[in-house]
């Protein structure tokens, strides 16, 4: 299992991520993460079939559109691009790249509800299922 955090970890939640866990953590720093040394972007494998480009998105102008995010994903050979910054949940397909913003469980914006995303990869086929989850 992999926990992916798209930035703006902020405060003590960052330390909770490091406590005993049964998952791999992949995280980038956001524009509100002033302490620490998280990378601004990260590329990693998800299972045997998917390559992920992860960025908070603030440096790629994702408030305007996903063009730079998709370009960076493609330059890095990725079929999935994940970002945060806007705190608005989104799952789209752009130029062969699955673009995912899980939203925010704490500070949703744009009229969205607190949310996160769950990705499941089917064994043997690599088929990806993405579920947007709203918190109660």
PLM regions and their residue ranges:
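Core catalytic region of metal-dependent phosphoesterases/phosphodiesterases
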Residues: 1-46
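Active-site neighborhood of phospho(di)ester-bond hydrolases with catalytic His/Asp-centered motifs
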Residues: 2-8, 26-31, 53-56, 79-85, ...
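Active-site environment of divalent metal-dependent phosphoester hydrolases
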Residues: 10-14, 32-37, 60-64, 81-93, ...
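General small-molecule cofactor/ligand-binding pocket signal
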Residues: 26, 45, 55, 129-131
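Active-site-proximal segments of metal-dependent phosphoesterases and phosphodiesterases across multiple
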Residues: 34-76, 107-110
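Binuclear metal-dependent phosphoesterase catalytic core
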Residues: 40, 71-77, 93, 100-136
